[in-house]
């Protein structure tokens, strides 16, 4: 899995490409988010528009990172979810835990 990141209007944006199914790909995303939080990032948008599928290992990383960001007083927002990814969050009842946005721009612009 390739993961890109950049800063837009002071907000860190991370965009993984592929599937969050565990293993080294999921570890790469987990490490990147941990590194951003350690560098003092206060707002991170995880753009999941090119994430084709998320399994329990991928959900575990999202939950772990949401907790880490929450404990640090930082925000982790999910944006641009595919229907499959959103279905997984809805079925697992995690869509109510995460701040989910229709687009990356909406997540960046939101002050919630």
Task: Please describe what each predicted stretch is.
Residues 99-103:
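Short acidic-hydrophobic, aromatic-tinged amphipathic segments that line or gate anion-handling sites
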Residues 110-112:
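A short, charged, amphipathic alpha-helix used as a generic interaction element across diverse proteins
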Residues 83, 105-106:
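Acidic phosphotransfer microenvironment of two-component signaling modules
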Residues 1-15:
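Short beta-strand/loop segment at the start of cytosolic alpha/beta domains
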Residues 12, 20, 105:
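Residue-level detector of flexible, active-site-proximal loop/helix-junction positions
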Residues 20-98:
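Amphipathic alpha-helical interaction surfaces in cytosolic regulatory modules
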């Amino acid at each position: 899995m390739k993961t890109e990141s950049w800063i837009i209007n002071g907000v860190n944006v991370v965009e993984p490409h592929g599937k969050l199914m565990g293993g080294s790909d999921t570890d790469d995303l987990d490490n990147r988010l941990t590194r951003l939080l350690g560098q003092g990032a206060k707002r991170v948008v995880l753009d999941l528009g090119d994430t084709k599928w998320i399994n329990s290992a991928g959900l575990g990383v999202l939950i772990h990172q949401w907790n880490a960001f929450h404990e640090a007083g930082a925000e982790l927002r999910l944006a641009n979810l595919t229907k499959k990814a959103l279905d997984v969050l809805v079925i697992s009842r995690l869509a109510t835990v995460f701040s989910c946005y229709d687009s990356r721009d909406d997540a960046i612009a939101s002050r919630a």
